[in-house]
Amino acid sequence: MGKTLKDIFYRFSDDQVAFRYGVALKLSSMSLIFVGLVMFFLYILLKIDLIFFNANQFPGAKEFQEAYFDFVFSNSIDLLPYILGSLIIIFFAGLYLTYLILRPFKLLSKYCDDVCNGKKGSFNPEMLTDHRLLIMFSDYFFSVSEQMIAENKFKLTAIPERFTKVHKPVYDWSFFMSYFLIILALTVLSIIGVITVDTGIREQIIELSTNFLKATPSVKYFLSEQFVVFDLIVYLLISFHVAIHFSFGFYLYSKVATPAFAIFSTMRSFLKGNKSARVHLIGYSYLRDDCRKINKYLDLLSKLPE
């Protein structure tokens, strides 16, 4: 038991694991906050209902209030499993998202580690559709370095023109759009859940009002108008939710675009003759182990005679 807990502790203390779980928790938290805000505004509107009915002394208002609290409690209990289930789905979707984000770096570092340990490295760029600049140049870099190792000689290498004019991180739209679609799917899941809850509660409130209150035109008008107001609130929250996920998409992209460019520029500089070039990333601890393996591979190449 003690060993198991110790393994779990060390696993969660790993920077990459912490990053993956952190992203997954952020995604889950955004959806949870979104649902919480919708429920909060709905609760306020329903409280206004009670105040309105009691202030106007509608017949059956007292019975309506008692039924209302029973309704809120029972519906909260009924919705809890669905909310928890959705959060679990979003959490694991976040873990999968981070797996996709880190996969190119893992493949690069695995190749470097295999070669350094005397194994035959395998790097298949066709497996990846993201980080095309890094992947395409890495494929070129590894083909050149394999030849150097085979000949046991380090030699300066001409850089293909398409790689010489890149001096800053570039947007890989295929990468960004693929991850944005995943984030959008999570947003749609949250929105569908909120609309379903909103529709169900709305129907219940109308039914309660019909059963316990005199169905006067003023009551019908008040209920219809208050739900119009609530719809506006929901639309605003949905817009905010989508905007947050857009921002989160750019945030995730920045977490890999800068390191990808750093590795690319280091490899390019190395082929130009800067044998001391190494990957040094500050603030990207979740890639520390991968960068260490890449640097170890560069150490191996730098020891080749010229």
Task: List the predicted regions and their residue ranges.
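Short alpha-helical segment of the DHp
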Residues: G94, P104, Y111, Y140, ...
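Amphipathic coiled-coil signaling helices used for dimeric signal transmission
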Residues: R132-A158, L252, I282, D289-P305
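Alpha-helical transmembrane segments and their helix-membrane boundary motifs
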Residues: T4-R103, V166-G249
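Non-catalytic regulatory/interaction regions at protein termini and inter-domain linkers
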Residues: M1-F19, K153-R162, G273, K296-D299, ...
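Cytoplasmic juxtamembrane amphipathic helix immediately C-terminal to a transmembrane segment
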Residues: G94-D113, G249-F264
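Compact recognition or signaling/catalytic modules
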Residues: V242, F246, F250, S254-A260, ...
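Short, charged helix-helix connector/hinge segments
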Residues: K110-M136, S265-I282, D289, L304-E306
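Membrane-interface amphipathic/juxtamembrane segments adjacent to transmembrane helices
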Residues: N56-A61, L102-G121
